[in-house]
Amino acid sequence: MLHNMSNNIHNIASVLTESLSYFQKFQGKTIVIKYGGNAMVDEALKSSFARDIVLMKSVGMNPIVVHGGGPQIGKILEKIGKQSQFIDGMRVTDSETMDVVEMVLGGLVNKEIVNLIHQHGGHSIGLTGKDGSLISAKKLKSDIKPELTSEIIDLGHVGEVDKIDISVINLLLKGDFIPVIAPIGVGKDGFSYNINADLVAGSIAQALNAEKLILLTNTSGLLDANGELLTGLDVNIIDSLIENGTIYGGMLPKIDCALSSVRNGVKSTHIIDGRVAHAVLLEIFTDNGVGTLITCNESGTLITYNEQG
């Protein structure tokens, strides 16, 4: 028993020693985290995520959370008897659906995350992209055509980022708050738009020249056709994986924003397994991490590897 206790103490000491260099390296750095997937619905994972964010802030980092909430939106729509329609993974969003999206993302989900952070000793403020003109949006122009018809589908209030104004984020960081952001923007037409949370997180990370962009997923990272974790890719291989269908569906916007981010000022993007407790801390503060890391080398060639950058 004493031997086991000694081993446990040694392991804890090793982890803390390993983490120290990362605490020092990333002190004062901005980390944008896209929060979604199982980590948002499992109670234990929700708690561990909030603790991770508070610890990051406590050691001098500046975490910024951008969250999704698709399943929660779907549940409320079902309760009011409104059926959801998806085209290529995007929810067709009419005016009534957009009202629900704003209530769920800007209210229910956002404030739950803020409350969890507060429960674990952090100080957080929740907002949508409409607050402080944070996210200027534009309607997503879709050329999606359903099978067997040439009709072009109007996705309604589905948007994309037009511009990011980081003024309100900087005010919150200066006040030592953790920003928690719902991916809703407003267009020049005055309408609200629901935007893919991965793309919002990437746009905010680029605007802030963030040290890292972290995307939580329901997989162990970027996988090959055999389900094995990919840890050494360049941009050409990524393109071929998209072409042959290995990367598809919900992973496509993650890859798009990962590549765009590291091309536009973000030091590294991490696609990690949100099903693992304390995944964010393990990715940032340990040598091996829990996912796939995408970064640029000095020559500007994109590479992907599973080590801390």
Curated annotation (Swiss-Prot):
One of the GO biological process terms: arginine biosynthetic process via ornithine
Swiss-Prot/TrEMBL catalytic activity: N-acetyl-L-glutamate + ATP = N-acetyl-L-glutamyl 5-phosphate + ADP
- Going by the entry's taxonomy, the superkingdom of the source organism is recorded as Bacteria
Its biological purpose is as follows: Catalyzes the ATP-dependent phosphorylation of N-acetyl-L-glutamate.
Q: What is the lineage of its organism?
A: Bacteria, Pseudomonadati, Pseudomonadota, Gammaproteobacteria, Candidatus Pseudothioglobaceae
**Can you list the GO cellular component terms from the UniProt entry?**
cytoplasm
Q: Which organism is it from?
A: Vesicomyosocius okutanii subsp. Calyptogena okutanii (strain HA)
Q: Name the gene for this chain.
A: argB
- Pathway(s): Amino-acid biosynthesis; L-arginine biosynthesis; N(2)-acetyl-L-ornithine from L-glutamate: step 2/4
According to its UniProt record, where is this protein mainly located?
Answer: cytoplasm
Q: Where in the cell is the protein located?
A: Cytoplasm
In terms of HAMAP family, this protein maps to:
ArgB
Which EC number applies?
2.7.2.8
- Site residues, Transition state stabilizer: 34, 254
Record-stated family:
Belongs to the acetylglutamate kinase family. ArgB subfamily.
Q: Name one Pfam family in it.
A: AA_kinase
GO MF annotations, alphabetized: acetylglutamate kinase activity; ATP binding
The name under which this protein is listed is Acetylglutamate kinase
What are the record keywords, sorted?
Amino-acid biosynthesis, Arginine biosynthesis, ATP-binding, Cytoplasm, Kinase, Nucleotide-binding, Transferase
Q: Where does substrate bind?
A: 69-70, 91, 194
